[in-house]
Amino acid sequence: ASITDGTRIREFVDKAYHIATNGYPGAVHLSLPVDIMFSSFAEEVGLEERPYSQKAKPIAKAWPDPNSLSEVLELACNSKKPVIIGGHGVWWSHSEKNLEAAGNNLNIPIFNVPYHQKLLGEEANAYMGLADIHQYPPSEFALHNSDLVLVVGARLDNQLNFGNPPFIPESTKLVCVNGSHEELELNRAADLSLLSDPGVFLDTLSNLKKNNKWSLGANWFEENKKKKKEWVDKSLKDLEIEAEASKKNGGKIHPLQLSLDVQDAMSENDWLVIDGGNTHFWSEIAINIAGAKGKKLKGILHPGTFS
């Protein structure tokens, strides 16, 4: 938008901030013409009209339709092998702890959409890894054996194969939960969609156990934990074999070893910033392996539209 009246600068900025932080959050472009930029206006201009208070208002949260919510919860209650895939919408709604609690309380394995904001620390018990069969191969087992995939705060884009098989099997029920209608429109491929603030949905889901409506045991969760451990152990063993062979042949350090060494030198107060093709690829793998061994980092920044 372009500000065409200097007396309405306050109004335009207030509206831009509201648009940027509500619904489907994101950047808003606001132009200020040079003639207005170099003009002067009274400090109180615009305050004679509502809203009289220019303080930031609480962010509006989408509350789920009871009937639609009940349909999703019924699917979850009847599921034997559910999976949660979290995206940047969880981060925008400050619902990371709600996500972790749902996974822990209900024994549901949690995955992160690749190139989206990291939601949970790699050391979190319910977090398995990326929903990516290349950077985290055990996710293939989880997705291909699942009967319900709950995609919360994410888009069914190329990272998730647009929700299509073979990434998410045809036999699996695919549900998308988003905090804005704009995001839901991008997820038309879902079998079922729910307009809801991610935190509200995750809390309601988590409360199923407290209300004695959740019967899923720990077998499915433990299967995924076992697959993760097997992958970590095999990856480290293969790396050890390759390192020994490299020493004999005068080869160079493996990029996975380099990534692990970098993180080994870091503390829980350090941020890891990764970028660039193979560096990013191997670092993502190393992050999961190191996290499985108890490594904690303050945070991770990486390339991607939703990071």
What spans do the regions from the language model cover?
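Anionic-ligand anchoring segments at beta-strand to alpha-helix junctions in alpha/beta enzyme folds, i.e.
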Residues: 64, 76-149, 265-307
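Phosphate/diphosphate-binding loops
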Residues: 132-184
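Phosphate/pyrophosphate-binding active-site segments
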Residues: 74, 175-276
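Conserved thiamine diphosphate
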Residues: 1-23, 60, 145-146, 191-193, ...
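Short beta-strand segments
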Residues: 4, 29-33, 85, 151-153, ...
